[in-house]
């Protein structure tokens, strides 16, 4: 059981806040937290039950990661780099992730599922994430339990499928089987009834039809209507591979973006993951409808595909950064987004540090309708990520935002507070046995890796 929040004062050598609607960096200020809210930001030391007064911290709003996959990332880790697992199809979604995640969840005990969930949440918190949206198969409800137990602000997004058994054959053609839509929506509703709003609203749900090629028209319409009825975010993978685009064209004579628009799904409430195979016309359509793109550059770079943050922004789309299924490293994604954007645009002025920081703070909060997140100001939720800027690779320091994007890494995360609770200090989770969690999670993943079908998938 986590302790209740207490009055806390944290000193920042630099504090990222706002002035007249824009980012502002304050020098040598204190952030005072009372309960679950920020009470004040002041240059003078306030009274508090807990005082964190060490200099050399850069205080940021708690970082927001709107697209992450704990389980599939661990499944693929060190097995799918350098082209492994994708010889018969460019996307490991259909060769590794979908078949092995389903097989693994059928195989696991509840304890093993919880071990995997805890390991993922631990990595996220230690990496500076305060809020995470996590699409996952509904056979892993332990993601909710692990987030609640370890203090993460969590938007669980259990998948809905019309065809849950999409898998690429030896010829590279994806074949779709199953009809799980009604059952998945019922399971989503059950999870919503159990978890929505737990711990003062820290645990929430998002609707998550898996992708345009695995969800038929009826399911997409029904899921979207349900999300709008409940006022929860709606997220889906869109045009994440050439195969998906070809499938939707063959079925419906449309692109994935046009398909969603035809169904009434494309709108300001839609969080569209990846979109790497969207045309310029598709992106213009999405911008007109007000959709948000969830950009995850490193997972596509691993496959030799460009996913440029600046490209989506140039089409007028609100674009935020997520980790997807690669390394759960949000700071690493910011640097990758900067490098990939600048090199593909042949311009040093795109994807600036302030823009990228907004993509994991203010813009991400706006995408889910949370004006109390992604900002350090009185009245906002007490979610804080602090970077230790005293390391040799961060000194001397002139502009802390540029240092965060270009020089820092997740090992520099010093403090993470969520909902007024100090969870991470000195880079370690205060309420978790990190060694035990790591060992148990690794053992559970190893159980899947040992399966003959897993070894064949990784070699394919």
Residue ranges and their predicted role:
Residues 15-28, 41, 303-305, 365-404:
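Acidic, glycine-enriched loop/beta-strand segments at the rims
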Residues 19, 381-438:
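C-terminal cap of metal-dependent C-N hydrolases
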Residues 1-46, 57-59:
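N-terminal metal-binding scaffold of metallo-dependent hydrolase/deaminase domains
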Residues 262-269, 310-391, 407-409:
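His/Asp/Glu-enriched, well-ordered alpha-helical/loop segment
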């Amino acid at each position: 059981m986590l302790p209740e929040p207490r009055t806390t004062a944290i000193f920042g050598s630099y504090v990222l806040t706002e002035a007249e609607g824009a980012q502002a960096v304050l020098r040598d200020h204190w952030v005072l937290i009372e309960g679950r809210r920020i009470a004040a930001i002041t240059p003078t030391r306030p009274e508090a039950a807990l005082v964190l007064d060490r200099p050399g911290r850069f205080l940021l709003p708690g970082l927001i990661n709107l697209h992450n996959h704990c389980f599939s990332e661990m499944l693929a880790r060190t097995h799918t780099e350098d082209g492994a697992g994708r010889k018969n199809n460019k996307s490991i979604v259909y060769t590794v992730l979908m078949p092995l995640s389903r097989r693994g969840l059928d195989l696991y005990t509840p304890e093993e599922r919880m071990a995997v969930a805890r390991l993922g949440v631990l990595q996220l918190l230690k990496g500076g994430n305060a809020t995470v949206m996590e699409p996952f198969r509904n056979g892993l409800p332990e993601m909710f339990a692990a987030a609640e137990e370890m203090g993460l602000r969590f938007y669980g997004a259990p998948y809905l499928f019309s065809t849950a058994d999409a898998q690429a054959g030896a010829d590279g053609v994806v074949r779709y089987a199953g009809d799980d839509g009604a059952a998945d929506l019922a399971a989503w509703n059950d999870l919503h009834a159990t978890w929505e709003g737990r711990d003062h609203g820290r645990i929430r749900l998002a609707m998550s039809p898996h992708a345009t090629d695995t969800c038929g028209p009826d399911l997409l319409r029904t899921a979207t209507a349900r999300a709008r009825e409940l006022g929860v975010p709606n997220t889906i993978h869109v045009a994440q591979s050439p195969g998906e685009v070809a499938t939707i064209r063959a079925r419906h004579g449309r692109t994935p973006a046009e398909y969603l628009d035809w169904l009434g799904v494309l709108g300001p409430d839609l969080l569209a993951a990846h979109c790497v195979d969207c045309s310029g016309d598709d992106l213009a359509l999405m911008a007109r409808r007000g959709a948000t793109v969830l950009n995850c550059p490193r997972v596509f770079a691993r496959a030799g595909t460009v996913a440029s943050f600046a490209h989506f922004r140039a089409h007028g789309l609100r674009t935020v950064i997520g980790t997807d299924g690669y390394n759960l490293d949000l700071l690493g994604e910011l640097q990758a987004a900067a490098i990939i954007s600048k090199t593909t645009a042949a311009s040093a002025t795109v994807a600036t540090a302030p823009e990228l920081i907004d993509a994991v703070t203010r813009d991400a909060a706006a995408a889910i309708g949370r004006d109390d997140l992604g900002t350090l100001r009185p009245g906002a939720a007490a979610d804080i990520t602090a970077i230790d800027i005293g390391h040799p690779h961060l000194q001397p320091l002139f502009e802390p935002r540029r240092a965060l994007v270009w020089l820092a890494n997740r090992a520099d995360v010093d403090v993470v507070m969520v909902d007024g609770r100090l969870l991470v200090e000195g880079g370690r989770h205060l309420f978790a046995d990190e060694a035990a969690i790591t060992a148990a999670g690794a053992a559970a993943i190893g159980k899947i890796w040992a399966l003959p079908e897993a070894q064949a998938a990784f070699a394919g």
